[in-house]
Swiss-Prot record:
The keyword Membrane applies. It holds the Pfam family DAD. Changing residue 127 to Y: In OST2-1; ts; reduced activity. Residues 2-45, 93-109 are cytoplasmic. InterPro entries: DAD/Ost2. Component of the oligosaccharyltransferase (OST) complex, which appears to exist in two assemblies comprising OST1, OST2, OST4, OST5, STT3, SWP1, WPB1, and either OST3 or OST6. OST assembly occurs through the formation of 3 subcomplexes. Subcomplex 1 contains OST1 and OST5, subcomplex 2 contains STT3, OST3, and OST4, and subcomplex 3 contains OST2, WBP1, and SWP1. Interacts with SEC61 and SSS1. GO terms for biological process: protein N-linked glycosylation. It comes from Saccharomyces cerevisiae (strain ATCC 204508 / S288c). This is Dolichyl-diphosphooligosaccharide--protein glycosyltransferase subunit OST2. It is found in: Endoplasmic reticulum membrane. Its main location: endoplasmic reticulum.
Length: 130
């Protein structure tokens, strides 16, 4: 009776430690890049704070709906959640445009587009509530 050849399987611990090391390096690099960007453009702190507030508000809304287990004014919940997500997306696009990622777009134009898009988003969500 012939013995089956042993398969060469990598150790799980070495793979997971390599992934953890890569993650730590990536996190440190991202953190350094973020703080360098904040140092170069200090107004981004306000945008980031507002984005954090929007994420927190969306989590609170979802938690409230889960805890009360009733979604009677469902259109109000949807409008509130959609406005949090939509405003977050608009702020991220404004943040990208303010960091000179798009050389053809001036900062004033980027801010004006943000204001118009925010007004449209709020108008749509307000009319969605009824």
């Amino acid at each position: 009776m012939a013995k089956a050849p042993k398969a060469n399987t990598p150790k799980v611990t070495s793979t997971s430690s390599a992934v953890l090391t890569d993650f730590q390096e990536t996190f440190k690099t991202s953190k350094r890049a973020y703080f360098a960007q904040i140092e170069k453009y200090p107004k981004l702190k306000l945008i980031d704070t507002f984005c954090f507030f929007l994420v927190l508000l969306g989590v609170i809304q979802c938690t409230f709906i889960i805890l009360i287990r009733d979604n009677f004014p469902f259109n109000a919940f949807l409008a509130g959640f959609i406005i949090c997500v939509g405003q977050f997306v608009l702020l991220m696009s404004l943040r990208l445009q303010l960091c000179n990622s798009f050389p053809g777009i001036s900062k004033n134009r980027a801010f004006a587009e943000f204001i118009v898009a925010s007004l449209i988003l709020h108008f749509v969500c307000l009319h969605f509530i009824n």
